[in-house]
From Swiss-Prot:
SMART domains: RPOLD
UniProt-annotated stretches for the region Alpha C-terminal domain (alpha-CTD): 262-351
Name of the encoding gene: rpoA
Keyword Calcium: no
GO molecular function, one term: DNA binding
Free-text note regarding domains: The N-terminal domain is essential for RNAP assembly and basal transcription, whereas the C-terminal domain is involved in interaction with transcriptional regulators and with upstream promoter elements.
Enzyme kind, highest EC tier: transferase
SUPFAM superfamilies linked: C-terminal domain of RNA polymerase alpha subunit (SSF47789), Insert subdomain of RNA polymerase alpha subunit (SSF56553), RBP11-like subunits of RNA polymerase (SSF55257)
This enzyme's EC code(s): 2.7.7.6
Function: DNA-dependent RNA polymerase catalyzes the transcription of DNA into RNA using the four ribonucleoside triphosphates as substrates.
The protein's name in its UniProt record: DNA-directed RNA polymerase subunit alpha
Length: 351
């Protein structure tokens, strides 16, 4: 049994600050304070480890390479140790370059197979593996291989959605076509994470922690999105250790902070909500970044936005209703009286 007022007097961050001016598709800087002494390091290290090891992404998991001679007769390159005729680079070197390609499927599906044909003389770069409307190649293009005169080679590439690092030995178990070469797949889209702790003053005390978190991704996903995913993973793992009903032990300080909780809810990023790609793109184009900004829009304003149809409008209504919100809520006092903050929303969604 937990003690009453378990968190009374315990300092917790009021929200997350996002450095908008410094952010890009591949970089984000976040600040949260105040934490009790030591908690900044605990939270920062936990998020860093999850971000680097457990975020999902896309990678090439297998490739079938076929060379064609002058008469068009095909020959399958059976392993990474067999070289491709009239290609300057070793097959192993080419496979290493393919591992480095950062990509994503346009329809957000979990697997895709793509066929590419190249003839020499030509210099092939990472961008040559893009398929319009289906397979996006992110980042600056880089050199993959040089095809000499007479080279005629095709690549059948399998792209998978996964988590972390999966060695070729594991991917080999799922190969069905003889001659397909399994590859080490690095799915994680997070390239680098660093955090720093600075002293933070609250009242007369200056020994609280301020957590500064910096995230670099490969541009396939935005830093604020992967941070939300990492926090969700951590929360779900910690929840099994709670052996009491949290609603029965809400401290008085949480009741006093109702307004702060509502503000935090309204500051929720649209990118962290489970909207469809179409709805997200419409809201992003209209400059709507948070749940509060969306709730303040009228239905007429939403309908006038580009590419918003009836299905997208219904989706927005349904999403706002999950938080007991609706379109056209512009009076803050009205929000405070009508919003019922569900402290266990995510647990209910999953149950």
């Amino acid at each position: 049994m937990a003690r009453k007022n378990l968190l009374k007097g315990f300092k917790k961050p009021k929200g997350l600050e996002f450095a908008q001016q410094e952010s890009t598709e591949s970089y984000g800087k976040f600040t949260a304070s105040p934490f009790e002494t030591g908690f900044g390091t605990t939270i920062g290290n936990c998020l860093r480890r999850i971000l680097l090891s457990s975020i999902q992404g896309y990678a090439i998991s297998a490739v079938l390479i076929t060379s064609h001679d002058a008469d068009g007769v095909p020959h399958t390159i059976s392993s990474e140790f067999e070289n491709i005729p009239n290609v300057s680079e070793d097959t192993l070197e080419i496979l290493n370059k393919l591992k480095q390609i950062r990509l994503r499927l346009s329809d957000e599906s979990e697997q895709g197979d793509f066929h590419f044909e190249f003839k020499g003389p030509a210099s092939i770069t990472s961008k040559d593996f893009a398929v319009e409307g289906q397979l996006e190649i992110l980042g600056e293009p880089f050199y993959v291989m040089e095809l000499m005169k007479g080279a005629n080679v095709s690549f059948d590439v399998q792209v998978d959605f996964g988590r972390g690092y999966v060695p070729a030995e594991v991917n080999e178990k799922y190969i069905e076509i003889v001659g397909t070469i399994p590859m080490d797949a690095i799915y994680g889209p997070v390239l680098k994470v660093s955090y720093a702790i600075e002293p933070c003053r609250v009242g007369q005390r200056n020994d609280y922690d301020k957590l500064i978190l910096e995230i670099w991704t490969d541009s396939t996903v935005r830093p604020e999105d992967v941070l939300g995913e990492a926090a969700k993973i951590a929360k779900d793992h910690f929840s099994i250790f709670i052996n009491f009903n949290e609603n029965d032990y809400l401290g008085e300080d949480e009741d006093d902070n109702e307004e702060a909780v509502i503000k935090q809810l309204l500051a929720t990023s649209i990118n962290t909500l489970d909207f469809s790609v179409r709805a997200k793109n419409c809201l992003d184009s209209a400059g709507i970044k948070t749940l509060g900004e969306l709730a303040q829009k009228s239905e007429d304003e939403i309908e006038s936005m580009r590419n918003v149809g009836r299905m997208t409008l219904n989706e927005i209504h349904a999403k706002l209703a999950e938080y007991n919100l609706r379109l056209g809520m512009t009076d803050y006092s009205h929000l405070k009286n009508t919003i019922k903050v569900s402290r266990q929303k995510e647990e209910t969604d999953e149950a």
